[in-house]
Amino acid sequence: MNENSYWQKRNLQREKDINKQALHVENVLLRAYTQAQSYLTDKARQLFKRMQTASGLTEEQARYILNSSMPPETLVELQKQANQIDNAQLRKEAQNRLTAESYKFRITRADELKARSYIAAKQVADVQLQAQTEFYVDVIKKSFGQASTEIFMRRARELRRTAQFPVEVWNKETAYELTYIPTQQVETILNRKWLGSNYSKRIWGNTERLASKLEEMFTVEALTGKQEIEFVKELQAEFDTSFNVTRRLVRTEANYIHNQSQLEAWQKNGVKQYILIAVHDLRTSEICKKKDKQIFSVSEAECNGENGTFPPFHPWCRTVAVAYFGKHTLNGTIKALDPVTKETFDLPRGATYDDWFKKITELHSQDEIDATYKKIMASLKYK
């Protein structure tokens, strides 16, 4: 295995590791969303059970239920839930909401259900913020470490090539890793804004939208004419929508943080250029197809969506940036995947997405390619 193949293998393995970690985070968040949904579904069923109607609530019935008084002990229960939120800012927001309710002359059932919805959304945000922060910190440390290691090893190998005496500087059988990155740099990458926001602000925004949507569901207007089964389905739809956004955020932010960590290592170690590497498969976006193998100066790196020079370029973006050390970076061949047969074939390392797709069209008819694309998209749980 030559040096370029070695580092390509390391980079591919890093991508797989990040995706595996992301899947674990998504499963943690799915449990949090499912728990919150089950909790509010149970409260909704209790609400409908009071009227025992099979034809949907009338406006009068909905108004009667929502305007009835909330038992005093319920506020104590909600305050306990709010106090259990770990994140200080989220906990304060939940406590402030309940404080505002306590000042009212009479707290209605509508007030209670809206407060429950708000706290449930904050509990989800609490789990999400903790899980994603831990994930991203790990991505930063490992991606920065691997990028630094690659720079060190490539330069050491160049030293060996030009030295007047034998120097042992690289052993491909050893998994070298330079992992140290100052805490301040970790925080800088973690909180860096792109497209006007950062990961924590996007979590807040998504869960605030969920809270708002849930509160709207517990109004006279929303409940009038509703049957229990219909209401429960709408509740599930709101949670599904929010969770789909969450999955997109987890993956897109992971791509951003991985690439930013590498960029930090390049800037620190004087790397001058990088090259964009798009995934060669049928899911790749038109944006990333065009950017594949483009080379930029590190000083030009800008994460600005489709108009930027550094990934991610769009939601769910899988394109990565790789340090470019000159034409020899693209020497040799790579194993490319045939999406129709699932077999591999050789391509020049510098082959673009268009080069790969041209080879696929030479091997298969357009009908075969279209059918494969439909199967791939149908197999995805979330589009």
Feature map (PLM): residue ranges:
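Acidic, glycine-rich two-metal-ion catalytic cores of nucleic acid-processing enzymes
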Residues: 237-339
